[in-house]
Amino acid sequence: MEAPQQSAISEELEELLAHDLSEPAAALPEVPRYPAPKHRKRDSTEPPDWKVSFAQSVLLRTFCENVGNILTECYFEVVRSEDPDGFSGLSVESIDQGRVCLVQARLSGQVTLGPGAPAGPRGFCVRMSNLTSSLKSGHACHFVDLWQPAGSSDVVFRIYEPNVSNYAPEFTLRTLAKGNDCQGLNGLEYNLFVEIDLETFRGAVRMAKDHKADVLTLAVYAPKKKGPPGSPDVSFFVISYDADEVSSKFPYQSSTESEAHVDGKPTVIRANDTSSTGYDCLPPEEELDTVFSDRFGVEHLFHFVRGMERRELTLRLDQGKPLLLEYPMGGSSRADYIRFVLAPKIQ
């Protein structure tokens, strides 16, 4: 049988997805967003064109590793907001070489502009393997300064420990002559939110990869026979795949009170729901209505989830639209996240 082809994210969709889709991360202990002035290392050279400082090297490392799982080369935009409540730091919006997966991400940092800083967008493109391997020399308590020397195309970053005057590792990365290759997606709305335990979803994806399946089918079903007014609405979220020698199905049940449904609001399906739905197993197909069903590449899904650490994951689904999966970064800023947008497989 001929292998399914992977659809690219269309130009129409590239004009759709807005940043307001991100949901607040869970409350976390307050930690510094970037080094205090007394902790920063002094540069011995003239002021750089721009500089970004981070107080937690572990966050920057996690950020880069998750982006690097998908992108071999990445363009980072340096963003500085004049609004104290606005976003300043590193922003990513790039599509992979196969033009199948879009990565949107941002990480807060303190941005300083030098007198020679260029007007308009500022950024750099580097090979991700060089960046992530260099960041491994830092520990969780270390700070990171990242800057572009005046008049240079290189990017330099230094990893150091606060209040310690000993030698700090410094790396100079050659940048690639490549700009931002994506216009992004704006205004895309989703009708289905599926909340599922990260280890549960990652286990199904890993099993599909181990069995050499190319695609994973994500589906949402609802019983054709509805309960009496006021009774819970039952949904079934099913992960399945068909490999050459193994086929598998992972069904999950969810119960949502009918009164909770509001027109214009997405339906939230909690695959981790342990409340009784009245069903011992997934009913036969003839007793179910298909709410959503689409297929996505196992390889991309595996790279998405392998570096994640949060306990729960939210999948945004809608027929004919790409899968949207968002990973809040934590830290002191709730605006920091990595978002993966994956086009479905063509049948």
Residue ranges and their predicted role:
Residues 1-211, 217-347:
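DNA polymerase sliding clamps and clamp-related checkpoint/processivity subunits
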